[in-house]
Amino acid sequence: MNIKEAIHLYLSYKESLVEKIRDVRYLLLRFERYINPIVELDEIKETDCQNFLNCKGRKNNNYTRYWDYQFCKLERFFVWAFSRKFIHSIPLPKIRPTIRHDFTPYIYSTDELNKIFATALCYRQRYNIEYPYVIQTMLKLTYCLGLRSGETTRLLVEDIDLNNDLLYINETKFHKSRLVTANAPVMKMLKLYLDWRKSIVKKNHFVNNHLFLDKRGNGVPQHELQQAFRLICTKANIVRKDGKNVRLHDLRHSFATHRLVKWYKEGADVQTLLPILSTYLGHSHLEDTSIYLSMTHELLDKANIRFKTYVES
């Protein structure tokens, strides 16, 4: 059995379990192209897998979390194949490197956010499959509501409740669902977008119910939104001071941090409001939200002032 046939069987198996396979399909098809689709599965060597993992999983001679992510996906595939006697051994590296999880989120300033949103409308010179207006709206919504990028890309039209200013967030990171409230400017943005979307759907006879569509009428996938974001930041000349790559997920970190700064400026009881923010973001543990308290110097300064006032009173 060659690698192409094996991957097809594996993805069909995953689908039969009603599992989400979009991300694993993307990875395995990339692995298939890297190795060669007609290579026999049992002929894949450990060095082949090692080179594939290193191709996108190493940076500056350091192993990244993406290396580990790729390894886990490939391991499940090969364990499945081994259990069915499609291979005699698992060709993955025997020793997994230690992955450093010390990545510091980047908090975008208001000026940087404005540049990102403006550049989203003109970041490509040539024809591309995404509507710039769609990408801009997706980025704005991701930041304004603190969404995970996958939550944004999975939104359906029926998830938007214009009458009650609510969004239904389904299929989250922890397989939970939640309701997210939105303020008037965000709902106005969504209403304008839905009106535009309706005209595009009618003109092109699209039938897909995803909220955000590309020019083929398909939902914009997460990896395309991430790629668009990187291109936008490059064109807008937005770079991290530590030399690391910009990340779409940092829009979510920026939302949470900016919200905490605003509460401190308003004199609100942040410790009381923190659980509310945690629920809003869909965190499973309050500790996941508390990390934002030390995310910026401005936030620490505000906290120190509040503490000093408390001590002196």
Q: Which residue stretches match the model-derived regions?
A:
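Conserved catalytic core of the tyrosine transesterase superfamily
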Residues: M1-S313
